[in-house]
Amino acid sequence: MSTIKFGTDGWRAIIADDFTVENVKRVAYATALWLKQNFENPSAVVGCDPRFAGPMFADVTTTVLASQGIKVFRAENMFISTPMISLGTVRTGASAGIIITASHNPPAYNGYKIKAFYGGPATPDDIEKVESQIPDTVSLELKTVTDYVTEGLVEYIDLEDMYVEHAEANFDIPAIRDSGLQWAYDAMYGAGQNVMRRLFPDITFLHADYNPSFDGQAPEPIQRNLQEFEQLIKLSEGEIASGLVTDGDADRIGLYDGDGNFVDSHHILLLLIHYMYKVKGEKGEVYSTFSCTSKIQKLCDAYGLNNTVTKIGFKYICDLIVNSGKQFMVGGEESGGIAVNGHIPERDGVWIGLMIWEFMAKSGRSLKDLVQEIYDVVGKFAVERYDLHVTEEKKQAIISRCKGGVDSFGHLKVTKTEDLDGFKFFFEDETWVMIRPSGTEPVLRVYAEAPSTAESFKILDIVKADLLK
């Protein structure tokens, strides 16, 4: 049997290659062992996003857990997002949540994510405990889901109703609906579509139907994957005020303004800090990962807020939210995963989108104007990224150079260096470049921040030429 390893956000593999019924049984059995070892009366919420064969793998997981005496709350809905599983875990008081999803990976993949009782990612320590108990083979006498329902070990629950009610209790949905603004939503054929249809039945929808192959495209809300949606907004000639995008399991966000300009996570984080502190009067800790814009620190300084920078990965943010003992306000990462106070300690693309739309509706200001409000405090900026495909030997040589200290890249003089997770080299005028190796492939991720997109790419080109010479 193949060795199963969990990555930073669950176990993912190609369907019918390593992601098979037999391997899902192995992982579910190890999950059951972990649950029984750590909880007196263990229970779990189980569901799946719209990926191919998701319901089958969710049923397999359900029956394995039930066969071990674990109570399973099985999502009865077809379009289940990761945040819906996390919310359901908290609301039912379950020991854990399990969702069959490969998030934004290409359509050939599926995956298995474990959520903790507090409604966020399970800790690396807990994941290691599950992983270490995955058997080479597993032989179980499994009954049907219906049999386990009859025995009281499986209970179907409506996570869609639960999520919609939670959203309606925390947002002024009528204010967004009746604002006179037109909205658009690209579901990328993913799990956010049903709750968005229920909350906003009259907005413009794209890729919001059942397509388990995602029309052949990875459901990742990055600009190059969103050209059809971008054109839809541009062709509306300002009639659409904002466009929201979520990924396959709806925990990551993409956003557009009314001119069809992509608004990245760096800007979204700043907008949330601005909205929550200046408009809603909230206070609390701000958490951002190492690859996020330095403007977060600048805005926090202006507002008297504390910003803690973490290693890259939402699990580090979740750990601070859950365990720091401090009042939390907002936290997020460059890749589109953002969490806010008043919800679960989990990334949630739909939730963050609703916050931005509510900000627009209640302020009567365009997204472009709200971004300008941020620029008025911290200055204009752009963060861009190159992925450099290099040999492992070259990658290690570059990392060794970074560890030894760098005085300059081309004519760019380094004034300060940080190495929390990768290497960030600061230049004059608050610009910087960050170099970080991928842990899974011979790729170097190189980020740059400058006052404009053109200047950021200029820095990237200079650094790239210096690194590859």
Spans of model-derived segments:
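Proline/glycine-rich low-complexity loops and linkers
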Residues: 77-79, 132-164, 258-332, 338-339
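Buried hydrophobic positions in well-ordered alpha/beta secondary-structure cores of metabolic enzymes
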Residues: 9, 46, 85, 98, ...
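N-terminal small/polar loop signature for handling phosphorylated ligands or for N-terminal nucleophile
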Residues: 33, 43-110, 198-256
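An N-terminal, well-structured beta->alpha segment
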Residues: 1-68, 95, 152-183
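Short glycine-centered, acidic/aromatic-flanked micro-motifs in structured strand/loop junctions
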Residues: 47-50, 185-187, 257, 342, ...
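Glycine-rich phosphate-binding loop of actin/hexokinase-like ATP-binding domains
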Residues: 98, 103, 111-130, 251-278, ...
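Gly/Ser/Thr-enriched, mixed-charge loops and adjacent short helices
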Residues: 1, 110-237
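Phosphate-binding and adjacent anionic-ligand microenvironments
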Residues: 240, 282-469
